[in-house]
């Protein structure tokens, strides 16, 4: 089937729209599908996503599309950018509409709710082994990407030619640098764990602790990410790159991060539900915490920071209790396998 678009993006939230804007600005005809027809009509009328990225004009090559069948028929390249808790559901909806030559990449950051499975496992369960798969991950705030500010990300997949095609599609000399990576597993994990650590950094700052504590959490958070990654077969070196250290530093230190702001609100004494309402958008780290905690427990991987965030979010603990517990841990060498 002939392409009428270079790529179709599923998910018209802030990040999906930002990626679609970047692709269209790079000269690629891009279809952007969203589950809410009214939202898509607003995009068509306003030529902007005023709900999530106000004030940023959609390029002419970006085409909002409310019909999923039309969107998936337009291109064999499909970029999924939806919250992790609906990732499987969207793939189920897309499955009967995919082309024979479809190739699936996602920028969703997270694991499967309840099970803690990687999204590649979810994709394989829904789609089988028929389609090439890839993941896009790295330190990106949607607003900056949409505004054309310099950004760098990584992409890895099951098919080398698909990975290289994605690099060519996404890379832009003046706005987006794309690095190919061969660690499909590692790139998926980094995007989930960094959200958990960002909540912890936000809680620390909300309590009133300083830069020393925040930096310690980032550093030890990287240790936790690497430890869990190695347990599932990822490469430790991946977590020193864009999808590990890069995403971790960005999300833990800048208030554009919803996860960091969520943690800040908790640290200042707000309850979990109250803090979520204040953010006003999906806080991926809330679900990611349970997902990562579940995976770590299943594998027997020690992740003290993640465990304390889990206790605050799901077991009624407080940020002060979490800090006290972490500080009271047994003294150990920095280079020991466990903290």
Swiss-Prot record:
Pathway: Membrane lipid metabolism; glycerophospholipid metabolism. PANTHER family: GLYCEROL-3-PHOSPHATE DEHYDROGENASE, GLYCEROL-3-PHOSPHATE DEHYDROGENASE [NAD(+)] 2, CHLOROPLASTIC. Catalyzes the reduction of the glycolytic intermediate dihydroxyacetone phosphate (DHAP) to sn-glycerol 3-phosphate (G3P), the key precursor for phospholipid synthesis. GO terms for molecular function: glycerol-3-phosphate dehydrogenase [NAD(P)+] activity; NAD binding. Its EC number is 1.1.1.94. Its main location: cytoplasm. It holds the Pfam family NAD_Gly3P_dh_C. It is an enzyme of class 1 (oxidoreductase). It catalyses: sn-glycerol 3-phosphate + NAD(+) = dihydroxyacetone phosphate + NADH + H(+); sn-glycerol 3-phosphate + NADP(+) = dihydroxyacetone phosphate + NADPH + H(+). The gene is gpsA. Sn-glycerol 3-phosphate binds at residues 109, 138, 140, 194, 247, 257-259. Gene3D superfamilies: N-(1-d-carboxylethyl)-l-norvaline Dehydrogenase, domain 2, NAD(P)-binding Rossmann-like Domain. One of its GO terms (biological process) is carbohydrate metabolic process. The active site is at residue 194. GO terms for cellular component: cytosol. It is found in: Cytoplasm. NCBIfam families: PRK00094.1-1 (NF000939), PRK00094.1-2 (NF000940), PRK00094.1-4 (NF000942). This is Glycerol-3-phosphate dehydrogenase [NAD(P)+]. NADPH binds at residues 14-15, 35, 109, 142, 258, 282, 284. InterPro entries: 6-PGluconate_DH-like_C_sf, 6PGD_dom2, G3P_DH_NAD-dep, G3P_DH_NAD-dep_C, G3P_DH_NAD-dep_N, NAD(P)-bd_dom_sf.
């Amino acid at each position: 089937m002939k392409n009428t678009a270079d790529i179709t993006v599923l998910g018209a939230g802030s990040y999906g729209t930002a990626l679609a804007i970047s692709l269209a600005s790079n000269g690629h005809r891009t279809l952007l599908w969203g589950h809410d027809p009214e939202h898509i009509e607003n995009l068509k009328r306003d030529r902007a996503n005023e709900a999530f990225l106000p004030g940023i004009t959609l390029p002419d090559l970006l085409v909002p599309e409310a019909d999923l069948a039309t969107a998936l028929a337009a291109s064999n390249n499909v970029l999924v950018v939806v919250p992790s808790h609906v990732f499987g559901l969207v793939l189920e909806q897309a499955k009967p509409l995919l082309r024979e030559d479809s190739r699936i990449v996602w920028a969703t950051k997270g694991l499967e709710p309840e099970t803690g499975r990687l999204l590649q496992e979810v994709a394989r369960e829904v789609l089988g082994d028929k389609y090439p798969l890839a993941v896009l991950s790295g330190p990106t705030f949607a607003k900056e990407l949409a505004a054309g500010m310099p950004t760098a990300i990584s992409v890895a997949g099951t098919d080398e030619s698909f990975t290289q095609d994605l690099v060519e599609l996404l890379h832009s000399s003046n706005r987006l640098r794309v690095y190919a990576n061969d660690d499909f597993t590692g790139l998926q994990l980094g995007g989930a764990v960094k959200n958990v650590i960002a909540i912890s950094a936000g809680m620390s700052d909300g309590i009133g602790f300083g830069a020393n504590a925040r930096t310690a959490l980032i550093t030890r958070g990287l240790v936790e990410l690497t430890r869990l990654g190695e347990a599932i077969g990822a490469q430790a070196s991946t977590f020193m790159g864009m999808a590990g250290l890069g995403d971790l530093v960005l999300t833990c230190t800048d208030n554009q991060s919803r996860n960091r702001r969520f943690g800040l609100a908790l640290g200042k004494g707000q309850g979990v539900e109250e803090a979520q309402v204040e953010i006003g958008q999906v806080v991926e780290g809330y679900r990611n915490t349970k997902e990562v905690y579940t995976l770590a427990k299943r594998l027997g991987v020690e992740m003290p920071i993640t465990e304390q965030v889990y206790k605050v979010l799901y077991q009624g603990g407080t940020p002060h209790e979490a800090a006290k517990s972490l500080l009271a841990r047994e003294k150990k060498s920095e280079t020991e396998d466990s903290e």
